Amino acid sequence: MTTPLPTERTAVAHSVPTLGLAVDISDEGAVDAAVAAVESALPPIVGLANVAGVSSPVDFLDVTTAEWDRVFDVNMRGTFFVTRRVAPAMIAAGVGRIVSVSSISAQRGGGTYSKVPYSASKAAVIGFTRALAREMGPHHITVNCVAPGPIDTEIMGGTLTEERKAAMSADIPLGRVGTVDDVAALLTFLMSDDAGYITAATYDVNGGLQIS
């Protein structure tokens, strides 16, 4: 028997229909098929969170074209593919929320586990967000961005041992590495009706690391 994921249990508890799909968002055809499946199984899409991401620990002079493309294909190209695919439905509905995940690395220039490819791709997400907000505004669609600091996720490459967390936390005013719940709370707000007059914004979620 398969154990339900936490998201599945939450959906059942609130009687929310769900559909889980594993998709390579760097593949335009796969994105189109996945969104089509969601559209046929669930109510119209009026909220999109672009959260997929990959990093790179490679120093700039050692970055190959393949490595550069690998990072941009997911972090920026994938964000473009998914957003472009779902935007028409939001326009038709006359309402929408688009939130993309950038990174503090886009603002500070790398650090932690990320280097130039990751920082550049996440900076592109911020520019994408601001430009798209201009075009989507007349359709009552908000477009925002969150820029997390160090978060305990798989993108850190399994390097966040308790010892490393403690070392990283020393530079964070709030004294700890972030959790996925810290980011999810902001994403949830930006998807809500309460955020209807917020667009083209980038929010730091880093425990104050931007001032250290």
For each predicted feature, which ranges?
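Short C-terminal tail/terminal secondary-structure segment
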Residues: T188, T199-S212
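Active-site helix of classical SDR
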Residues: T83, S121, T129
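The beta1-alpha1 cofactor-binding region of Rossmann-like NAD(H)/NADP(H)-dependent oxidoreductases
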Residues: A22-A33, T65, D181-D182
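Alpha-helical segment proximal to the catalytic Tyr-Lys
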Residues: P88, R130, R134-E135, G196
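Substrate-binding pocket helix/loop in short-chain dehydrogenase/reductase
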Residues: D59-F60, E67-F72, R164-M168
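Residue(s) in the substrate-gating loop at a strand-loop-helix junction
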Residues: S103
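Short, small/polar-rich loop/turn modules that mediate ligand/substrate recognition or access, typified
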Residues: G137, T142, I198-A200
